[in-house]
Amino acid sequence: MIPFLSLKDVTALHGEEINEAVTRVVNNGWYLQGKENERFEENYAKFTGTKYCIGCANGLDALIWIFRAYIEMGAMQPGDEVIVPANTYIATILAITENGLKPVLCEPKPNTLEIDDDLIEGLITPKTKAIAIVHLYGRIAYSEKIGEICKKYHLKLVEDCAQSHGCKSYDGRVTGSIGDAAGHSFYPAKNLGALGDGGAVTTNDPELASVVRALANYGSQKKYVFKYAGRNSRLDEIQAAVLDVKLKYLVGDNLHRKEVAHYYYEHIHHPLITLPDLLPDDQNAYHLFPILVGEGQRDALHAYLEQNGVGTVCHYPIAPHQQECYAKEEWNNPQLILPVTERLADEELSLPIGPSIKAEEVKEIVKLINQFK
């Protein structure tokens, strides 16, 4: 069996150092808000090229705290609008709606799978306060045009970097340093994954950093003094220690992903399958390798590969605007039709890719795909 991703194998790549890090924390006896957090936050800020990194419980919380902080700072208020890609994972939209903000869904480009920057300006209203870009699948979503739109309309640019650890923009900036603030997820399956949940906010804004740090600690900037109504959303010391180990190997692990991706690009040849545009290497961290399967054959290919011992996953089979939880929301008009987003939900299939996959496994996957009938 070739798994979609074996977390056991991924962890084993750096297992000795990870075990040493966990043991160090256990023996130290300090499990929250200690030196491990300080060290990781400092190192991850350096990696992303930002001044501030604030660890938190998970990637969803990271995004929630960014928007909540902007509300506390007076930059936004409930009812304001945030433009967001319609084909994102639902967490991006949850972070917006959890703060009483209104998501305005923007279609992606079918050849890149990222937000269509040609459509953004037409969605802006007097209530628009931010654009949230999502570097989906590890592919860069930022463009010079998006930056210009933000400047023209004085909009905040928020990055969802849950899938883009180590990805760079066309101008060389690492994701997480491009916008005004960025949310990161360290879910175990990510390019930089913990041994449980974890997240972080990166920014160059000192006020935002201070408010986010307080919100993630019950709303407190001083012990037993609560300026905001926050929540317990802290990154624990064990996860911080593990992440600091894995951060050292992120560039090398991403390089392996790129080698696998290039093999897919060069050797997958099937009339039903379309691959997204090949980006310059630095502009794709290859968190996932999405393919589009036409003529209603996505599920058949998924089942065929499963039967032949290959795990694949659909990202994502139900678009956010079609989810039951948002069925009655005012912003989610029943007549809302997003043909590109809905097509991607019907056709996308992610192939195995990761730092532990072997060359012979990749070759077997390609052979099976090309033989699919």
Regions picked out by a protein language model, each given a short descriptive name:
Residues 1-30, 308, 352:
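N-terminal "arm"/small-domain region of PLP-dependent enzymes with the aminotransferase-like
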Residues 30, 34-81, 95-99, 105-106:
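Phosphate-binding glycine-rich loop
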